[in-house]
Amino acid sequence: MKKYLFILFLFLYYSKLFSNQLEDDLIGNLSLYTIGKNETLIDISRRYNLAFPEVLLNNPTIDDPWILEPGKVISLPTRHILPKGKREGIIINKGDLRAYYFKDENTVHSFPIGIGRANWDTPLGKAVIVGKKKNPYWTVPESILEEEPHWPKVVKPGPDNPLGSRAIYLSMPGYLMHGTNKPWGVGMRVSHGCIRMYPEGIEKLYDLVEEGDKVEIVEQNIKAGWQGGVLFLEVHIMHEYGL
């Protein structure tokens, strides 16, 4: 089932894509991409630091994200307005399904994320990073075991571990940022409340952050920002995509 993502930008300019120098409220750029042979939408999306649902919904003429037409030109939504808030630590925006890490007052790193599904909503609020772990074990919560009894009580590191290769633990009990063994779930509301990231995304963020760094989870579906004296607007409506 599709639920539509609508992104509106006015008066767009161009800047850097992944690690961005902060001069105004906008980062990245909008770009076009020509599909190559045997490429899937998740291949393209990961290469450009995007979630495939946002690319799919930005290109409504694509019928199947796994079977693409070579030579077809698609647009990539690699332009973002920064969420409102103090630019320090991590801001997780449920409104556009992205995490923003402010390395300092001049540089930001942005990552696509997946968040909690219905009845397992990712909470809003403020936290700090209380720990980091490479190749984490997953102690399965009782609430998940009740819903999915096939899980063992503890899942060892490896390809079957939903936490992936890295975990960043938050002061919100039971919530963390982690990798995944199902990267196609990034950009969706599919988790049990944790913040899911691409393997390469969590590895990069893991190396950047430290214990004690601040984290704020917000939900801003409508964002506005300035660049060069011009006001820009970005709107996300029904930003969920379910399979």
For each of these PLM feature ranges, what is it?
Residues 80-183, 207, 235-236:
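Gly/Pro-biased beta-strand-loop elements
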Residues 15-19:
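Sec/Tat signal peptide C-region and signal peptidase I cleavage site
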Residues 20-27, 52-89, 214-215:
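Extracellular LysM carbohydrate-binding repeats and other cell-envelope/extracellular binding modules
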Residues 20-49:
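Primarily a LysM-type cell-wall glycan-binding module
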Residues 220-243:
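Low-complexity, Gly/Ser/Thr/Pro-rich intrinsically disordered linker/tail segments
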Residues 4-12:
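Sec-dependent N-terminal signal peptides
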Residues 191-206:
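Short beta-strand-centered segments at strand-helix junctions
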